[in-house]
């Protein structure tokens, strides 16, 4: 029987520094724009925001970080745009550089009214994350009246996959593994292919059958599912042998 090492909750998965994205956010530090971090579910938006917060704490003094995570029940009472606005204003600190971070901002109905009002005051450096299904690039200009910059986060690239496993000894073998496992790093926590596949399937179904259907009130989910499957098959056709090493 194979011996299994049990890990504490929170220790089951390693993290890597996603330098490309972190460097981009650092470049935008202090600019007069709303920084909007978008991407599909489980692509690493929240982890990126947390990494940036840690960077600020380690490199700057006299700062005030206002952090709101709408996935956390502790912030349930401010999932209303007036309450969100009031909460941020209450936590503002005069004489400091005030950073505002709102994770999963779309969970607060009419959030854009609060964010636009806070932006207009000119006293916050604002960062928000949101799912692609609710913060499409085409919608951002309508939602935000002030200047904004979008940072779009993708699942792990092949290069990041190699970095995660700290191995570039056999690129062909690693690419074959990557083609099966994909770039959703949350699936790497599971030991069996079945569990990894179930994780990816659940993320896919949440995006297609819940997020998109809910946003656009689509009556026929079967057509949407078939279309998404066709697009996935089409993308695989374009991953050819010459593509392998160019991805690292």
Predicted regions and their residues:
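Structural recognition of the conserved hydrophobic beta-strand(s) that form the central parallel beta-sheet
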Residues: 125-131
């Amino acid at each position: 029987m194979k011996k299994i090492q049990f890990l504490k909750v929170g220790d089951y998965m390693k993290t890597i520094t996603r330098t490309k994205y972190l460097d981009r956010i650092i470049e935008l530090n202090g600019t007069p724009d709303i920084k909007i971090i978008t991407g599909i579910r489980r692509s690493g938006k929240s982890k990126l925001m947390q990494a940036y917060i840690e960077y600020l704490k380690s490199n700057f003094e006299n700062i005030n970080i206002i952090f709101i995570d709408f996935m956390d029940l502790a912030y349930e009472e401010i999932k209303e745009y007036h309450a969100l606005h009031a909460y941020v204003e209450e936590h503002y600190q005069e004489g400091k550089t005030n950073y505002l971070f709102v994770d999963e901002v779309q969970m607060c109905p009419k959030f854009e009214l609060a964010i636009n009002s806070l932006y207009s005051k000119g006293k916050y450096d604002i960062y928000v994350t949101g799912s692609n299904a609710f913060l499409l690039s085409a919608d951002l200009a309508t939602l935000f009246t002030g200047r904004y910059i979008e940072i779009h986060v993708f699942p792990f690239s092949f290069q990041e996959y190699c970095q995660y496993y700290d191995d570039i000894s056999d690129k062909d073998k690693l690419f074959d593994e990557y083609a099966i496992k994909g770039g959703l790093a949350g699936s790497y926590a599971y030991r069996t292919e079945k569990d990894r596949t179930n994780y990816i399937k659940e993320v896919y179904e949440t995006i297609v059958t819940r997020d998109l259907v809910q946003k656009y009130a689509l009556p026929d989910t079967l057509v949407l599912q078939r279309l998404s499957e066709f697009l996935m098959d089409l993308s695989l056709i374009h991953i050819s042998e010459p593509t392998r090493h160019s991805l690292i």
